[in-house]
Amino acid sequence: MKAKAILLASVLLVGCQSTGNVQQHAQSLSAAGQGEAAKFTSQARWMDDGTSIAPDGDLWAFIGDELKMGIPENDRIREQKQKYLRNKSYLHDVTLRAEPYMYWIAGQVKKRNMPMELVLLPIVESAFDPHATSGANAAGIWQIIPSTGRNYGLKQTRNYDARRDVVASTTAALNMMQRLNKMFDGDWLLTVAAYNSGEGRVMKAIKTNKARGKSTDFWSLPLPQETKQYVPKMLALSDILKNSKRYGVRLPTTDESRALARVHLSSPVEMAKVADMAGISVSKLKTFNAGVKGSTLGASGPQYVMVPKKHADQLRESLASGEIAAVQSTLVADNTPLNSRVYTVRSGDTLSSIASRLGVSTKDLQQWNKLRGSKLKPGQSLTIGAGSSAQRLANNSDSITYRVRKGDSLSSIAKRHGVNIKDVMRWNSDTANLQPGDKLTLFVKNNNMPDS
């Protein structure tokens, strides 16, 4: 079947998560590939409108036509094929989950002139779960161990793990395999085996067979049992997906509405706030941006967020309207009165959470309000006093510009941003008659971005 035209743009799609056992890698890839880490990253073009395939395009038809590796008839492939075919519902579910990622991954593989069979490895590795982690701490859809990730430029910090970032990890995985393929003289089966078990093991197996006068092709090498199954799994999947109708496997209909579009962030922003503006759940947003480990986007990781295409315009409009503007650390002007302010306790508040939110100490809160303990009641008023702690509030505050929208009130704006109405009035000269489009300056802490 001839594939219909597909525009393989740099657009990611993400489906639902799955759990399952993931294989343990013994990758021992060296740092030699670091120099190529950015070679293709800079070439990754994004379609900011979320466009990924031409009308009537069929992703699986395209991939099926590109699966061109020869598949020998042997017991190892036959065994893996039978295992997959005994659970056809799994094949449907995992390809549905894989579809979102496939647009970008297949595009990168095609651009690099690599075998399309490689896009099937994340099915073998992790069932396309970006949150998957093995016992050896291999992570992401490509199951990359920490040391290999570092060798290939994958940033791993407390707040961001590029091994779970689909773009970064795919770039690294393909860089690895390109390097390995050169090492093994263009033999892709040996390349895939080395990706799984490490180049050292494959080279040692080749050396052993040469010394014994045996063949050095993949099927003849004395490799670990996992690796002996790893390559056949990839080839079994290739045969099944290429001939899905013959095998009675129902592949999901591709749906471009699941495509993720990149939305730029000019500064760090709370994930809960982005989810609210985009109209999606926080859990889905975390899956779409699995590399981010904390609750803040655009801090340690990429300066953009991936959201479904159908939500991208809504998010861009919200960002542009000033619901959240670029945040820059700003000291409150010297002539701004900071003698005191009043905070109304909300349900769920604790003394420590209020202190953290406002940049003051719990001791100061107790002193200013003559509190003997830490017990609070919703609706209770707390005075935030002057002095050093008040100045710390100013020093730890951020200035944002909020553009008033239809239906807004001074009260709703203040509540949304966790500030006091009196402060909003103090920071802005004319708040008596708010109109849509009016701009307000607010001083808030980064961790006090609106969450509703």
From Swiss-Prot:
InterPro entries for the chain: LysM_dom (IPR018392), LysM_dom_sf (IPR036779), Lysozyme-like_dom_sf (IPR023346), Transglyc_AS (IPR000189), Transglycosylase_SLT_dom_1 (IPR008258)
Cellular component GO terms, alphabetical: membrane; plasma membrane
Domain LysM, chain residue ranges per copy: 341-384, 400-448
Keyword Nucleotide-binding: no
EC number(s) per entry: 4.2.2.n1
Keywords of the record: Cell membrane, Cell wall biogenesis/degradation, Lipoprotein, Lyase, Membrane, Palmitate, Repeat, Signal
Lipidation (S-diacylglycerol cysteine): C16
List of catalytic residues: E125
MF terms in GO: lytic endotransglycosylase activity; peptidoglycan lytic transglycosylase activity
Record's signal peptide: 1-15
Residue ranges, annotated region (Slt-type domain): 113-198
Gene Ontology biological process terms in this record: cell wall organization; peptidoglycan metabolic process
Topology of this chain in the membrane: Lipid-anchor
Lipid addition sites, N-palmitoyl cysteine: C16
Catalytic activity: Exolytic cleavage of the (1->4)-beta-glycosidic linkage between N-acetylmuramic acid (MurNAc) and N-acetylglucosamine (GlcNAc) residues in peptidoglycan, from either the reducing or the non-reducing ends of the peptidoglycan chains, with concomitant formation of a 1,6-anhydrobond in the MurNAc residue
Subcellular location: Cell membrane
Notes on the domains: LysM domains are thought to be involved in peptidoglycan binding.
NCBIfam families cross-referenced by the UniProt entry: PRK10783.1
Role description: Murein-degrading enzyme. May play a role in recycling of muropeptides during cell elongation and/or cell division.
Family: Belongs to the transglycosylase Slt family.
Name used for this protein in its record: Membrane-bound lytic murein transglycosylase D
Organism: Escherichia coli (strain K12)
